[in-house]
């Protein structure tokens, strides 16, 4: 199975002090045959969050290096999903502005035979990363 990690799941996986790091890391370890995925939106979101949020305090260069190390450490498990979806691919459940990116990512994952892996139970048609 391919799991496109949303920004929050990607940040939690990469930052050991994140409140959900153990949850995401345990899930990843429990599914060694699963393929993890990123895309331009999730990678850029990862950089933005880690460079902008005071809790992380990383520069853009440091955040980029962390993401590259994460992907290299699990090279056989990470793939990059190219994004060729336009707005016609948005799921019908997208009704509000806050749902647009989540809907797009869910559609991108589904279009590549996978699921959007998230910590947010409010996003329909996704895979909710379980608590350990």
Question: What are these model-derived regions, one by one?
Answer:
Residues 10, 122-123:
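Catalytic metal-binding/acid-base residues of hydrolase active sites
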Residues 39-43:
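Short, conserved alpha-helical segments within structured domains
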Residues 1-38, 53-65:
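Short, well-structured N-terminal submotif of metal-dependent ribonuclease cores
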Residues 125-132:
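Active-site regions of enzymes building and remodeling cell-envelope glycoconjugates
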Residues 49-50:
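Short, well-ordered beta-strand segments in beta-rich or mixed alpha/beta enzyme
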Residues 73-121:
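Active-site neighborhoods of divalent-metal-dependent phosphate/nucleic-acid chemistry enzymes
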